[in-house]
């Protein structure tokens, strides 16, 4: 129900962004950590 109320309780510790779901915060944290969890099947890049 947070989506409709505008409540965003999950805040990034590195910047001022807030998120409705913790999964979205975890995905956003990759911007700061540089983590690339999925490898390309064609080349060695991630």
Swiss-Prot record:
A zinc finger (C2H2-type) spans 1-4, 10-32, 38-46. It holds the Pfam family zf-C2H2. Coiled coil: none annotated. PROSITE patterns: ZINC_FINGER_C2H2_1, ZINC_FINGER_C2H2_2. It comes from the Eukaryota. Krueppel is a gap class segmentation protein. Belongs to the krueppel C2H2-type zinc-finger protein family. This is Protein krueppel. The lineage of its organism: Eukaryota, Metazoa, Ecdysozoa, Arthropoda, Chelicerata.
